[in-house]
Amino acid sequence: MTILIHGASGAQGAPVVATLLARGESPIAAVRDESSYSGTASAVSVDSSSVESLVTAYTGADAIFIHLPIGSGEQQLTQARAIVEAVQQVQPARVVVSTSGYPVDGPEGVEMPIGVLLEGLRASGVSLAVVTPKLFLENLLLPPVTSGVHDDAILRYPLRADYAVSWASHLDVAEVIATLLLDPTVTGTVGVGALPGLLGDDLAAGFSTHLDTPVVFEAQTPDAFGASIIPLFGEAGATPVVDSYRWRATQADEVIDADTSAQQRLGLTPRSVAQWLSDVSA
């Protein structure tokens, strides 16, 4: 079975490759430059903004994992449209998409890249599963976040203290994606994350358990968080991230639907915060 993994050297794609390899599969890593890929899978260079490049990569693939990398809204829209066109042309047997926590629907009249991607893929007629994580636990390992934990015993993050989220790790999401790539009978939405949703205090408690020292949660403004991550992602990369947290500030919570959760549909339960920290040796 030929399985192509977008962004195979990145935070989302690399764990999917590792999970598939552990299951005895031979995934193909779709990366920007195969000569710089240091992973253990076979690799192919792909320009996600080029329909021609995508069609070449997709041809012969039985299953494809797709997600949009961090970038400006314009860059992501270009990639979404190119991916849709390539899938429509090639018609692979199976496509699995991660929304990466991005909102599908935006303000009236505003095209959201992930919304454009999903609408086009659904119209293509291919077997499609959509994995919908909310927030990744790995965000809590960003240097601006971990410095607060280790220096001040404070977990600072741009969410209200009462904002419940179905947090999930990339490791848990990879397990779900790998399962779906190998099982085309499951289609539609599959939510990944903690049920019930976790509050900031729950996250801090996980760090407290792992570090064996008290850690408290402190809500941060999206703008303050954005200023701290610009050195990591650049302004173009940080802007949509900050916008997503401004959007979250207007919402009641971000909890997956139990009926369409991976727990219900696939029998897969995500790690606790403390277990995840132990697994990644943070």
Predicted regions located by residue number:
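Actinobacteria-biased recognition of intrinsically disordered, low-complexity terminal regions
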Residues: 1-2, 282
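Conserved acidic residues
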Residues: 41, 62, 93
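A hydrophobic C-terminal alpha-helical subdomain
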Residues: 223-282
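Short glycine/proline- and acidic residue-enriched helix-loop micro-motifs
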Residues: 66-69, 260-261
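Oxidoreductase cofactor-interface core, primarily capturing Rossmann-like NAD(P)-dependent enzymes
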Residues: 2-34, 49-52, 59, 68-78, ...
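Rossmann-fold cofactor-recognition segment
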Residues: 38-50
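Contiguous, function-dense segments enriched for cysteine-driven chemistry
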Residues: 28, 82, 269-273
